[in-house]
């Protein structure tokens, strides 16, 4: 089965991708036979990490056009990954107004815990009695974003905290959060969003979301799934896609004749 386009890739234009390279990512996409690639750079306004900076959206658009001119046999899409866009509506809309974008991802990375803003990758560093509540807060914040009127088309890495689940805790089980996850999926389906299958960790246990949630997505009426490696360097483009396509197909979604199309029910 041919690989689908990778619709979630970061390059040197994202603050957390020092090894990213747009041109080399295009070369990698052609090398492995992808029909297309979407560069979805971080547009984040929570500043809790060292080296964080605002996306140079004008420079990004210029780089996209250079790559389109150079790699004519690859469909290159422009995009952004909006972090907590419902917290920052004005800068979000400014980024979206700066030029045409083919893909706009909505993501939750951070939540508010007491007086702190905490990235979900750092939940494991919080006191043990805070961690279960932090996961529930993550899903509450995701629902708030989906129910907001912020303009994005794809819900990215729905159960992002699973990537960083502490090995000394009980295994992550979707069923423990089923009510919250289904509420998010239902709201996303009503809004007509695409659900991303994020393969950044490769193995099925860390596919975000996994088979169980992808099946729930179909049950609540979700229409489409996209594939995103969340690559932050060229050699990771489409990483885990072989397995991800099998899982998405097992959940009841299938490709169309157009290799650039989303997978649908």
Give, region by region, the residue ranges found by the protein language model.
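Extended substrate/RNA-proximal surfaces in nucleic-acid metabolism proteins
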Residues: 50-190
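An N-terminally biased module of ancient metal coordination in phosphate/nucleic-acid-related enzymes
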Residues: 1-86, 96, 102, 162-178, ...
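Active-site-adjacent C-terminal substructures of enzyme catalytic domains
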Residues: 175-238, 247, 254
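Short, basic, glycine/proline-bearing loop/turn elements
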Residues: 8-12, 76-80, 126-130, 196-201
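C-terminal regulatory/interaction regions
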Residues: 249-252, 262-265
């Amino acid at each position: 089965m041919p690989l689908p386009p990778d619709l979630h890739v970061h390059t040197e234009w994202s603050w957390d991708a020092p090894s990213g390279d747009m041109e080399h990512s295009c070369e990698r996409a052609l090398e492995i036979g992808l029909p297309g690639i979407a560069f979805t750079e971080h547009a984040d306004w929570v500043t809790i990490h060292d080296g964080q900076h605002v996306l140079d959206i004008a420079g990004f658009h210029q780089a996209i056009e250079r790559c389109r001119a150079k790699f004519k046999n690859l469909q290159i899409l422009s995009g952004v990954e909006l972090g907590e866009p419902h917290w920052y509506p004005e800068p979000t809309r400014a980024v979206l107004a700066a030029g045409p974008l083919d893909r706009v991802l909505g993501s939750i990375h951070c939540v508010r815990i007491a007086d702190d803003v905490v990235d979900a990758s750092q939940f494991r560093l919080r006191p043990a009695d805070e961690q279960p509540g932090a996961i529930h807060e993550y899903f509450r914040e995701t629902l708030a974003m989906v129910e907001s009127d912020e303009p994005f088309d794809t819900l990215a890495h729905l159960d992002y905290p699973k990537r960083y689940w502490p090995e000394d805790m009980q295994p992550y089980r979707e069923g423990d959060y089923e009510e919250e996850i289904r509420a998010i999926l239902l709201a996303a389906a009503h809004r007509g969003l695409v659900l991303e299958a994020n393969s950044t960790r490769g193995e099925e246990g860390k596919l975000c979301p996994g088979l169980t949630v992808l099946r729930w997505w179909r049950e609540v009426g979700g229409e489409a799934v996209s594939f995103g490696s969340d690559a932050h360097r060229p050699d990771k483009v489409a990483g885990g896609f072989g397995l991800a396509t099998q899982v998405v197909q097992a959940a009841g979604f299938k490709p169309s004749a157009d290799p650039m199309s989303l997978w649908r029910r």
